[in-house]
């Protein structure tokens, strides 16, 4: 998507977001400056900021940005070292409201969380059950699980417990076109069923299967062992 031209439509976009988002919408210069950097040397002043209260706010923000052809950038704790949190986009900050543990299943050893939860907060919630979330980057007291997923973060014990990608069972996602779906590890039979069902989800999975079939040999030969 193209950035809003010189912020020419920023006022319209801000008004659209304020009409449809219950959380905070900030387009003032001070807020934009606060979100212009992460832990790297990069700096990009965003179009504006949305602090969603819930998933409905996220869906509304996606719809507004789609309407105005504005990029959207989900943000965690801003601990990235390579500018991942910096862009001329509408920034979604999940850390204020969408930061909870929703469910813990000790028997099956999984937890369901919101993207803005800080890793240490998750670890504290898991501790009574003698469980941990294996990846442990050095920024564990301020990085978020959503940011870890976006970055596929590792840590000192990742050789033992794996990277973030190895510790995520499924994700509930919303795409730029508004499609909502749950994704995760998929068997060949499940993949065939999803594609047969058609719709946007089936279209996406069929496209992914096509990419795998076309490029799998090259990927396996060249993908780094990390």
PLM region descriptions:
Residues 57, 70, 152-155:
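Charged, amphipathic alpha-helical interaction segments
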Residues 1-67, 77-109, 138:
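N-terminal flexible segment immediately upstream of the FAD-binding catalytic core
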Residues 72-74, 81, 122:
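Extended, hydrophobic alpha-helical segments in both membrane/secreted and soluble proteins
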Residues 100-226:
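FAD-binding subdomain of flavoenzyme oxidoreductases
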């Amino acid at each position: 998507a193209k950035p809003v031209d010189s912020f020419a439509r920023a006022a319209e976009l801000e008004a659209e977001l304020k009409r449809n988002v219950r959380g905070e919408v900030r387009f003032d210069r001070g807020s934009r400056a606060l979100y212009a950097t992460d832990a790297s040397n990069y700096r990009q002043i965003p179009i504006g900021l949305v602090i969603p209260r819930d998933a409905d706010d996220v869906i509304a923000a996606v719809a507004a940005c789609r309407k105005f052809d504005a990029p959207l950038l989900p943000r965690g704790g801003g601990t990235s070292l390579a500018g991942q949190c910096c862009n001329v986009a509408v920034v979604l900050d999940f850390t204020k409201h969408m930061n909870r543990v929703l469910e813990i299943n000790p028997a099956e050893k999984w937890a369901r969380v919101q993207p803005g939860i800080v890793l240490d907060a998750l670890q504290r919630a898991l501790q009574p059950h003698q469980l941990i979330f294996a990846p442990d980057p050095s920024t564990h007291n301020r990085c978020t699980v959503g940011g870890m997923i976006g970055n596929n973060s590792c840590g000192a014990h990742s050789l033992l417990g794996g990277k973030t990608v190895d510790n995520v069972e499924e994700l509930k996602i919303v795409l730029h076109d508004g499609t909502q779906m749950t994704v995760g590890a998929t068997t060949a039979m499940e993949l065939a069923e999803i594609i047969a069902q058609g719709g946007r989800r089936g279209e996406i999975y069929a496209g992914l299967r096509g990419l795998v079939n076309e490029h799998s040999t090259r990927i396996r030969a060249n993908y780094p062992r990390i």
